[in-house]
Protein backbone atom coordinates (compact mmCIF):
# COMPACT_ATOMS: atom_id res chain seq x y z
CA UNK A 1 0.00 0.00 0.00
CA UNK A 2 1.18 3.46 -0.73
CA UNK A 3 1.81 5.92 2.01
CA UNK A 4 0.04 9.31 1.56
CA UNK A 5 3.23 11.07 2.64
CA UNK A 6 5.10 9.49 -0.29
CA UNK A 7 2.68 11.06 -2.79
CA UNK A 8 2.96 14.55 -1.35
CA UNK A 9 6.57 15.42 -2.43
CA UNK A 10 5.83 14.35 -6.00
CA UNK A 11 2.79 16.62 -6.16
CA UNK A 12 4.76 19.53 -4.73
CA UNK A 13 7.54 18.96 -7.26
CA UNK A 14 5.06 18.90 -10.12
CA UNK A 15 3.44 22.09 -8.85
CA UNK A 16 6.85 23.80 -8.65
CA UNK A 17 7.39 23.34 -12.41
CA UNK A 18 5.46 24.28 -15.50
CA UNK A 19 5.79 22.81 -18.99
CA UNK A 20 5.80 25.54 -21.63
CA UNK A 21 5.74 25.31 -25.40
CA UNK A 22 7.77 27.76 -27.49
CA UNK A 23 6.37 28.00 -31.00
CA UNK A 24 8.21 29.63 -33.89
CA UNK A 25 6.69 31.40 -36.88
CA UNK A 26 7.44 28.41 -39.11
CA UNK A 27 5.47 26.08 -36.82
CA UNK A 28 8.31 24.38 -34.94
CA UNK A 29 7.46 23.67 -31.31
CA UNK A 30 9.87 23.05 -28.45
CA UNK A 31 8.79 22.00 -24.95
CA UNK A 32 10.54 23.33 -21.85
CA UNK A 33 10.16 22.42 -18.19
CA UNK A 34 10.71 25.56 -16.14
CA UNK A 35 10.45 26.31 -12.44
CA UNK A 36 7.50 28.58 -11.76
CA UNK A 37 9.71 30.86 -9.69
CA UNK A 38 12.65 30.99 -12.16
CA UNK A 39 12.99 33.86 -14.65
CA UNK A 40 12.25 32.93 -18.26
CA UNK A 41 15.60 34.32 -19.47
CA UNK A 42 17.28 30.88 -19.37
CA UNK A 43 14.48 29.31 -21.41
CA UNK A 44 14.91 32.10 -23.97
CA UNK A 45 18.70 31.63 -24.13
CA UNK A 46 18.39 27.86 -24.57
CA UNK A 47 15.80 28.26 -27.33
CA UNK A 48 18.03 30.70 -29.23
CA UNK A 49 21.10 28.53 -28.70
CA UNK A 50 19.29 25.53 -30.21
CA UNK A 51 18.35 27.66 -33.22
CA UNK A 52 21.92 28.94 -33.54
CA UNK A 53 20.89 32.58 -33.15
CA UNK A 54 21.41 35.37 -30.64
CA UNK A 55 18.78 36.27 -28.08
CA UNK A 56 18.06 39.62 -29.72
CA UNK A 57 17.09 37.81 -32.94
CA UNK A 58 13.74 36.85 -31.39
CA UNK A 59 10.85 38.54 -29.67
CA UNK A 60 9.11 36.24 -27.20
CA UNK A 61 5.39 36.92 -26.90
CA UNK A 62 2.94 35.57 -24.31
CA UNK A 63 -0.73 36.61 -24.32
CA UNK A 64 0.05 39.47 -26.70
CA UNK A 65 2.80 40.99 -24.55
CA UNK A 66 6.53 40.79 -25.08
CA UNK A 67 8.51 38.86 -22.46
CA UNK A 68 11.65 40.62 -21.28
CA UNK A 69 13.17 37.59 -19.57
CA UNK A 70 13.09 38.74 -15.96
CA UNK A 71 9.48 37.63 -15.52
CA UNK A 72 8.66 34.26 -13.97
CA UNK A 73 5.87 31.88 -14.99
CA UNK A 74 4.17 32.66 -11.65
CA UNK A 75 4.18 36.40 -12.40
CA UNK A 76 2.65 35.78 -15.83
CA UNK A 77 0.11 33.25 -14.49
CA UNK A 78 1.44 30.55 -16.82
CA UNK A 79 0.09 27.01 -16.65
CA UNK A 80 1.15 23.69 -18.15
CA UNK A 81 0.82 23.72 -21.92
CA UNK A 82 0.85 27.51 -22.35
CA UNK A 83 2.43 28.70 -25.59
CA UNK A 84 5.12 31.36 -25.96
CA UNK A 85 5.43 32.66 -29.52
CA UNK A 86 8.99 33.18 -30.76
CA UNK A 87 8.91 35.78 -33.53
CA UNK A 88 11.90 36.99 -35.47
CA UNK A 89 12.65 40.46 -34.16
CA UNK A 90 12.38 43.28 -36.65
CA UNK A 91 14.01 46.66 -36.44
CA UNK A 92 13.33 49.87 -38.21
CA UNK A 93 10.17 51.21 -39.68
CA UNK A 94 8.17 54.30 -38.94
CA UNK A 95 5.03 54.98 -37.00
CA UNK A 96 2.02 55.68 -39.18
CA UNK A 97 2.11 59.42 -38.46
CA UNK A 98 5.80 59.61 -39.49
CA UNK A 99 5.32 58.02 -42.91
CA UNK A 100 3.72 61.10 -44.40
CA UNK A 101 6.75 63.18 -43.42
CA UNK A 102 9.06 60.61 -44.94
CA UNK A 103 7.36 60.95 -48.31
CA UNK A 104 7.37 64.72 -48.10
CA UNK A 105 11.06 64.98 -47.24
CA UNK A 106 12.59 62.29 -49.41
CA UNK A 107 12.28 61.54 -53.09
CA UNK A 108 11.40 57.83 -52.94
CA UNK A 109 10.92 57.59 -56.71
CA UNK A 110 14.52 58.51 -57.40
CA UNK A 111 15.91 55.43 -55.69
Curated annotation (Swiss-Prot):
Keywords: Cytoplasm, Isopeptide bond, Nucleus, Ubl conjugation pathway. InterPro entries: Rad60/SUMO-like_dom (IPR022617), Ubiquitin-like_dom (IPR000626), Ubiquitin-like_domsf (IPR029071). GO terms for cellular component: cytoplasm; nucleus. It is found in: Nucleus; Cytoplasm. The keyword Iron-sulfur does not apply. Coiled coil: none annotated. One of its GO terms (biological process) is protein sumoylation. SUPFAM superfamilies: Ubiquitin-like (SSF54236). There is a cross-link at residue 93 (Glycyl lysine isopeptide (Gly-Lys) (interchain with K-? in acceptor proteins)). The keyword Lipoprotein does not apply. Stress conditions rapidly and substantially elevates the amount of SUMO1 and SUMO2 conjugates with a concomitant reduction in the amount of free SUMO proteins. The SUMO conjugation system plays an important function in stress protection and/or repair. Interacts with SAE2, SCE1, SIZ1 and MMS21. Covalently attached to a number of proteins. Interacts with NPR1; this interaction promotes NPR1 phosphorylation and triggers its sumoylation and subsequent degradation. Ubiquitin-like protein which can be covalently attached to target lysines as a monomer. Does not seem to be involved in protein degradation and may function as an antagonist of ubiquitin in the degradation process. Promotes NPR1 sumoylation to activate defense gene expression and regulate its degradation. This is Small ubiquitin-related modifier 3. It comes from Arabidopsis thaliana (Mouse-ear cress). The lineage of its organism: Eukaryota, Viridiplantae, Streptophyta, Embryophyta, Tracheophyta. The gene is SUMO3.
Amino acid sequence: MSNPQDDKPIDQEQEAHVILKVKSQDGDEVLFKNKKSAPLKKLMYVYCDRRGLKLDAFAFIFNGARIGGLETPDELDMEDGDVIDACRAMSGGLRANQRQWSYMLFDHNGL
